[in-house]
Structures are given as structure tokens and as C-alpha cells.
Amino acid sequence: TISAPLNLTGTTPRITSSMTFSDLTKTTTTADGIFFTAGTTQTIASGGSITLYGAASNLLSVSSSDSAVFTINFADATASYAIGYVSMSYVTASGQNILAINSTDGGNNGGITFASATSGTLRYWIATTSTTWNSTANWSTTSGGAGGSSVPTTTSDAIFDGNGNGACAIDAAASVKGLYLAGYTGTVTQNSGITV
């Protein structure tokens, strides 16, 4: 068990045994990857998080080093993730399903949904100050992008990923396909109903 946050800054790190992490992070803007030995289980502890992020022009490769499946296990519902701009293969998620944003499916994955902002189904909260849910100025089709997109609906996933940490007050009845909070340090206040 690694109880302190672990930020992997080296090139193509490999994790060769089953581990439990409080916080595991691998981010990059250049060509890079993180690899795990097949058959291992990487558990994200209660209240912990895993962050795997590449860039639009350089997806972070997340894969088994042995062309067989490894598992990312979430200990409970309080374990969280922020995963985007990755290419994943031979990964099984357990305990929670993963929404990999702007990412590609390299095959042999389970429990992972790959979504692209270009599909029009994702809405990112981008407000930097306290404001309300029901304003299009607070929503973007890309993480940290320009506001003015439609407010999330039953066909949209509302994503709070830390690229807008302003507090959000749900000021009108809302229904969304999914609600994802990962890396967000603000507060969502429910002043009206929300259906997920």
C-alpha cells in the first residue's frame, strides 16, 4: 500500500505487482505511457484517486506490458478518477465504470466507456467563480474550453474535472445522463432537483 500521493514523472513507468494507492497520477504532454503487469490489480483506496491524462496530440498509452488484462479496482464509491486523452488496452475496471474522455479504445478493455467531446454528449463545467448550473456560459464542449454550450440534459454527461472550480448552485430542475466529479475542488449545491 502506498498511502502518500504518487506522481509518476519518469518516462514509461512500469508497475509490476498488485498495489493499493491513495492517489496515483501520470500526466504528460509528450508521447509516453504507463504499463502494468498482466494479472495484477491496482486498487484505488477509499477516498483516493487515479489521474491519467495525456494531450490531444499525444495520447498517454495505458496498457498491460504482457498483452493480457490487468485490473484497476476502486475500493468504493468515494474513490475517484480523472482519465482523458489516453489510449487504453488490456484494462478492466472494477468497483466503478470509467469514462475515458477524448480517448481511444485499443482493445481488450472492460468496464470502460470511451467518449469524445466532438460527439456533443459531454459538457464540462468551466466557471471559475460561484455561479449557477442553468447558465450556458458555464458549460463547454471541451475541458477548460470556451463557455456557451448548452446546459447538460438527459443525453449529456456533466463533467467537473477541475478546469473550472467555481462553486455550482443547481438552481433549476436538472436531468443528466451522468455526473462526474474528478479533480474538482469546488462545491455543488443542490437548490433544486437533479436526476442522474
Task: Label each region the model flagged.
Residues 1-196:
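Extracellular beta-sheet-rich ligand-binding/adhesion modules
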